[in-house]
């Protein structure tokens, strides 16, 4: 689970159905342009807004593209409850090389209960877990000690870590991680996290600029930093409104999906936000597009 993994949007048709053809085209484009793997049914994919039948369509399309390229597929499977997370994990394990399971949100369980949650989900399936730590969304912050306890579980292959910055707990975890793959999930922080020892990143922005993110991850200190600095304005613009609205609009403008639609309660982005993001995209260095 190293390198850059593109967190895929779920395209919709103008009639509001899942656009399997656009999803296949986007997934294939990402892999053909250097990303190491794909992520399906994450937050970027509006997984919570899909029906069970639509989620299965997404999984089938992404599995076929990933297997055809020999690339790993990470699949989102987790919610606030342990029993429901186990159910989702069992339903989706057959499609996945790893399951992305969020820290239980809103309830703010104890640290011990969070560790037990991941142990229970991991015991229910035969594929490894990537716990998803995103405290500014879940409302549950975990100290480095607990993050390392989670990483030490046999069922855990690594972690998607989104702290919204690089804090002391992040530094401690990276310095002490027991041979597990820490993947940065904050697109703007992937490069500095890589330099500090992260194994890679899970990036929504890599849907639009897969070559640039792949090159940034492979680059040495000078080249990687140059690409990071070039990508930062694009990442900031793509997240300037609730995601993935701006990203989908840019993907449609770039011809990578057919329609930019998002589902309620998300709304179409302001044209100015899309223009800013596209300008940053087109300003990327030659060879990075």
Over which residues does each language-model region extend?
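Generic structural "secondary-structure junction" signal
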Residues: 6, 10-14, 51-52, 136, ...
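Short secondary-structure transition/capping segments
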Residues: 50-53, 86-87, 111-114, 142-144, ...
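Catalytic alpha/beta core domains of metabolic enzymes, predominantly
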Residues: 123-124, 135-239
């Amino acid at each position: 689970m190293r390198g850059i993994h593109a967190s895929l949007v779920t395209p919709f048709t103008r009639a509001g159905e899942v656009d399997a053809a656009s999803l296949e085209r986007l997934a294939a484009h990402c892999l053909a342009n250097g990303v190491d793997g794909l992520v399906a049914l994450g937050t970027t994919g509006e997984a919570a807004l899909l029906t069970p039948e639509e989620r299965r369509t997404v999984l089938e399309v992404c599995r076929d593209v990933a297997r055809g390229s020999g690339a790993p597929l990470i699949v989102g499977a987790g919610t606030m409850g342990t029993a429901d997370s186990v159910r989702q994990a069992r339903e989706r394990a057959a499609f996945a090389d790893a399951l992305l399971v969020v820290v239980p949100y809103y309830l703010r369980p104890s640290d011990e209960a969070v560790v037990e949650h991941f142990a229970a989900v991991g015991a229910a399936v035969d594929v490894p877990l990537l716990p998803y730590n995103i405290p500014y969304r879940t409302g549950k912050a975990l100290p480095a000690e607990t993050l390392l306890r989670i990483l030490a579980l046999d069922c855990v292959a690594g972690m998607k870590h989104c702290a919204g910055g690089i804090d002391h707990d992040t530094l401690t975890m990276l310095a002490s991680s027991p041979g597990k793959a820490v993947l940065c999930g904050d697109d703007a922080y992937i490069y500095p996290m890589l330099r500090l020892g992260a194994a890679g990143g899970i990036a929504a922005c890599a849907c639009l600029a897969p070559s640039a993110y792949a090159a940034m991850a492979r680059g040495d200190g000078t080249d990687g930093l140059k690409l990071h600095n070039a990508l930062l304005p694009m990442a900031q613009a793509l997240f300037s409104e609730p995601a993935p609205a701006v990203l989908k609009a840019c993907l449609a403008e770039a011809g990578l999906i057919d329609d930019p639609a998002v589902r309620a309660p998300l709304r179409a982005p302001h044209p100015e936000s899309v223009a800013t993001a596209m300008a940053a995209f087109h300003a990327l260095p030659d060879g990075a597009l």
